[in-house]
Amino acid sequence: MSARRNADLDRDPSPSRPTVATRPLRPLRPLAAWLMKRLEGVDDADYRRHKRALFADLSGTIVEIGPGTGANLAYLPRDIALTAIEPSPAMRRYLAERAIELGRPLTLLEGTAERIPFPDASVDAVVCTLVLCSVADPAATLAEIRRILRPGGRFLFIEHVAAPRGSWLRRAQWLARPCYACFLDGCHTDRETWRTIADAGFVQVQLAHFRTHPGVTAPHIVGVTTAG
C-alpha cells in the first residue's frame, strides 16, 4: 500500500458537524420508526446483558431521552418515575403501545435532547441508548443532561461509535453514513462519542468498549457518568 493511501486512511473523513447529506429527512421518520421496530429483536439479543446490568439499580426520577419504540421499557425497573422524551410522532405511537402492552406507567413528552423540558438539578438519572448517534448536537445534549441531573445523578448510556481511525471499517462507516442518516432518522455511523462524553464535564466517567453483530455499527460503548 502506498504512503499516500496510508495517509488517506489515517485522515478522519468525518466532519465534526453533520453535512446536508447526513441530516434526517422528516418525511422518512415514519419509515425510520417502522425499521427500528422491526430491528428490536436483533438489537435485543446484542444489548440484553448490558441493559440488565446497567439499569438494575435505577431508582427515583428517571428521564429517558430518545426512547424510540420502547426497546428499553422491559429492562427498566417498574418502581421508577419514568418520563420519556421523544421527538418523532411515529416513534411515540410505538412507544405508547409498548407501554400499554407491558402495563407500566409512563409520562411521554414531545421534545428534543438539546432542550430537555425539566428544571435544573431535578432528575436522579438519565438513560440514553443509541441516541447520541442521531442528535443534531451531541455536546449540547450532554450539557442538557448535566443540567437536569441532581448532584451525584447518573447518565447511563449505550451507543454505537466510530471504528479506529485509519481502519477499513472506519472508511466503510463514512461511506454508509448518508444512507443511515437518511433512513434511520439522522443516525451517524462514525461519531467518536466516547470523546464527546469524556469532554462533557462530568465528575466521573466509566465506560467500556464492546462489539455487536458484524457491520458498520459493530463498535459500541456502554457506561455511566456522574454529575457534580
Language-model features: locations:
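C-terminal lobe and adjacent flexible extensions of AdoMet/dcAdoMet transferase-like proteins
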Residues: H220-G228
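A short glycine-rich, Lys/Arg-flanked "PGG" loop and its adjoining helix->strand segment in the class I
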Residues: A139-P151
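A short acidic, Gly/Pro-enriched loop at the edge of an enzyme's catalytic core
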Residues: E114-V126
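Short glycine-centered segments of the SAM/dcSAM-binding site in methyltransferase folds
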Residues: A81, G152-R154
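A short SAM/SAH-binding and catalytic strip from SAM-dependent methyltransferases
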Residues: D124-D137
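C-terminal alpha-helical "lid/dimerization" subdomain adjacent to the S-adenosyl-L-methionine
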Residues: R23, L35-A45, I158-P219
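Class I SAM-dependent methyltransferase SAM/SAH-binding core
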Residues: T61-V63, P67-R115
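Conserved class I S-adenosyl-L-methionine
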Residues: S2-G60, A71-N72, P89-Y94, Q173
